[in-house]
């Protein structure tokens, strides 16, 4: 299991467009991917799992990847967050 935390810097938080792009990025990997904000968790490969968290600017999220390609998934997803959110 690999994970990282990230503080959202996008003024609008995780809204529809980047959430869709994030789901597409996560879908490239076979490992299980989860996003969490506090006690709430969602499946990073499902748009509703991401949007239901209602992540806003300045909030911290934790992304967890578990499975065969977890190292590659964590690296790619962390880069995505830094570039887009």
Each PLM stretch: what is its role?
Residues 1-8:
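Short amphipathic
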